[in-house]
């Protein structure tokens, strides 16, 4: 069996595709919508446990739905996330959660591999976003992905074992299906204190978005 045939189960992927319409990339700049999800619903237990960054009592909660093959998502994590972490997450102003919303089998595979690393999931996601062009858009993406994750300590045996884990794959798509129930139909999508924003946030607009959310939380 070649590496390219080790893609996550096509049957499960197609079932997920039938369950919810596969989205496209969101607008390049974040746009506030009229949709608001109550925090008790947004923070309800997911099919996979949330990986939370920041203090539990932070006044602003940001939940991002992302795909590993979304270029806007990669740009956000490269250009904006470092500032978000330094100025807002690490200072106790923001609690941040990234949830899986794979656009395709390549993204699902990348999320599965990141989840296989336990508490190193977010570091793996940051790495794979940084390396996105080198694995996601090649002629042999799964072979390229296998080579990329070697730098994360994932050898060939673990790579193959992880991509055969149908329980994990179903859970990742269940997270995405729940996101769609919240109104997610493109990536990246952000919920900031429950208010839905479509598209990538930029550094310039970040202070006002968070300031407005803080005011609304008081």
Where are these regions (language model features)?
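Structural alpha/beta surface segment adjacent to cysteine/selenocysteine redox centers
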Residues: 66-69, 74-150
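Compositionally biased, intrinsically disordered low-complexity regions used as flexible
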Residues: 1-2, 113
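Glycine-rich, flexible loop/turn motifs
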Residues: 39, 48-49, 109, 131, ...
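Extracytoplasmic thiol/disulfide redox context detector
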Residues: 2-6, 14-102, 173-176, 215-218
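Short capping/connector residues at structural and topological boundaries
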Residues: 56-58, 106, 202
